[in-house]
Amino acid sequence: MTPDREITFVLTSCGRFDLLEETVHTFAACNTAPIARWVIVEDSGRPGVRDAVAGTGLPFEFIENDPPIGQMASIDRAYATVTTPYLFHCEDDWRFFRSGFVEESLVLLERLPEVSAVMCRRAGQNARHDAIVATAPPRTLEGVVYRLPPPHVDDVWFGYGFNPGLRRLADARAFGSFAARGHEKHASLWFKRRGMGMASLEVPACETTGQERHVGDATATPGWETVGRARPPGTVAAPRSRNDPCPCGSGERYKHCHGLPG
């Protein structure tokens, strides 16, 4: 792969080492694209992450947060080390089951500037995700079948997200600090305002394994934010209209910021 197409694999983990082990082993077994660097950021403050991935034989680099700093700040730490033009963002609770998906995603990102990231998860595990994807007809580009929902289909989601998928480093750099923005939903809104959104491969490549193991529950590591399920930190007084700017200074409308349901 030429330098202008190089990819860094970045995975966020938080103490669910059994799920992490399956994630990296199945990705390694299915992936056929050259990966320049393999980076894991571990935010549990617990030992075990190195042992969980040792069997892959891959040259993982580790960023271990102790004490934990949260997902968004962890993403900032990991992304700050990336120098390749593309990165495959992954979480610790996925199972991959087919090859070629990284190369297919690269085709879309190279040809479609309006695509912020390329998702590859299967249907049937997230009803809202499935409903958004279903609004777009299948399209084909250089043999890759995909869907690209228009930004207006959902008020908040599908502008950007942290499910497994390839994305451009340049877009992440343009966005800036994820921790400073607040939550995954605010990243999504930022990209939507710029007319960008996530594409979804018609032939899926992965499925989540952590639906019953959200990081905030008793079987996982305490103190982790459940991204997309909470308001931004702090409280503010509601403005007269939910369409007014949020008083917190985020630049979002109140209904898309502190006015989001908890």
What do these predicted regions represent?
Residues 66-81:
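Glycine-rich, basic loop-to-helix element that forms the pyrophosphate-binding segment
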Residues 99-118:
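Conserved donor-nucleotide/metal-binding helix-loop-beta segment in metal-dependent transferases, i.e.
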Residues 118-133:
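Short beta-strand-to-loop element that shapes/binds the nucleotide-sugar donor at the catalytic cleft/hinge
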Residues 16-30:
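Short, well-formed alpha-helical segments that are part of the catalytic scaffolds
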Residues 22, 157-239:
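C-terminal catalytic/acceptor-binding lobe
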Residues 40-50:
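A conserved acidic beta->alpha catalytic loop
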Residues 85-95:
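Short beta-strand-to-loop acidic/aromatic patch adjacent to the donor-nucleotide binding site
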Residues 231-262:
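Acidic/negatively charged segments and metal-coordination signatures
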